[in-house]
Amino acid sequence: MFDLKEYLERVKTEVTDPILEYMQEAEIEDFTADDVARCGELLVEYLTALSELKEPVDADIMAQVEKVVLALNELNEGLDYALIETVEREAIWELLQTAAVDCGLQNVPEDVTEEWREW
C-alpha cells in the first residue's frame, strides 16, 4: 500500500540527508545544498503525483516515473553528473521502484527507471 508520509520521510533519510552528510564530510564543492534540496523536491513531486492518482494504472504510474527520471537527469547533467553517484543512484532507484509498485504498478520491470535514466 502506498503511504505518502512514509515515502516523504524516506526521501529525507535515504536520499537528501546522506548526500548532505557526504557533501560536508568530503568537502564536496561540485554541487550545493540547494542542488540536494532540488533533488529532494523532484522526488517529493513524484511521490505526491503518485498519491494523487485516483485509479492508478500502469501507464499513469510509468508516466510519473519518466517525468521524475528525466528531471533528475537534467539536474544531474547540469552538475556534470556529480550529484547522483553510485550510493545515491541505488537509494533513488529503490525509492522510485518501490513507490511505483506500492502505488499499484502491475507489470513491474526489473528497473522502472532504466528506459530513461542517465545516472
Question: For each predicted feature, which ranges?
Answer:
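A broad, low-amplitude sensor of folded, mature protein cores
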Residues: M1-R10, D58-A59, V112-R117
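Mature extracytoplasmic domains of secretory-pathway proteins
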Residues: L43-L75
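Residue-level recognition of alpha-helical structural elements
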Residues: D35, K54-I61, Y81-E88
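Generic structural signal for well-ordered, non-transmembrane alpha-helical segments
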Residues: A37-G40, V44, E66-N73, E90, ...
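Amphipathic alpha-helical binding modules
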Residues: L79-W119
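Surface-exposed polar/charged interaction patches
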Residues: E14-D17, E25-A26, A49, L53-P56, ...
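Alpha-helical interaction segments
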Residues: K12, V36, E74, A82-L83, ...
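Short terminal alpha-helical segments
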Residues: M1-S51
